[in-house]
Amino acid sequence: MKYSDFKKKVVDWPIIFSRDVVSRGKSGQAVRNQLERWKKSGRIIRLKKGVFILADDDRRVGLSRPYLANQLYGPSYVSLEYALGYYGLIPERVSDITSVTSLKTMKFANAAGTFIYQHVKLKAYRGFVLVEGDGGLKFFIAEPEKAVVDFLYLNLEKFKVDDPDIFEGSYRFQNTEKLGAKKIFRFADLFENRKLVKVASLFSKYCSLKLGGA
């Protein structure tokens, strides 16, 4: 396959899987070898084994990193620090795309960024929604309350059950009035962890104090 033919076929694809490029009558290995040559020449960018995007000059579709995060490893949904920044619950927007998965913990670093996946048990793998991002590309992201609970659980060793100041002092949580206490408790219960439930309760009290002082 010539590069011009390949580009014509995939120019509107937001992500390219090598398995989708195999032409009738061509072996998978031949396609993989060809993709490797185009990668070395800079025409395509490798995100992980068998997964690529076109280089910036040739790509017609915008780059949506949350969408890529869903596609690179899954099942997964965007959560933790990136989701907290997305919802404005912390002041900074995080550059790394942080996600939760029911699979093992994983990390990919490539030209599109750093994609971090943290494991939670299957029972706790819920509380996410499908949203539309850049270029109309849809991706799964935690609900605001689930992003908080995922963050608390996966950083549980850093929290005490009697120190509400840490939420504002160390992590600078903000805009917490939009969060629902019942949802926070419901999501925390999924993890079946006593300390998490206590920390989630402390966080809810912190939110109530902030709301009362507003």
Feature locations, PLM:
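Hydrophobic alpha-helix position signal
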Residues: 38, 83-84, 188
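Short gly/ser-rich loop at a beta-strand->alpha-helix junction or flexible surface loop bordering the NTP-binding
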Residues: 46-55, 65-124
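Short small-residue beta-strand/loop micro-motif enriched in glycine and branched aliphatics
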Residues: 62-63, 126-128
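Hydrophobic alpha-helical interaction segments
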Residues: 128-214
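Generic structural marker for isolated residues within well-ordered, non-membrane alpha-helices
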Residues: 18, 80, 184
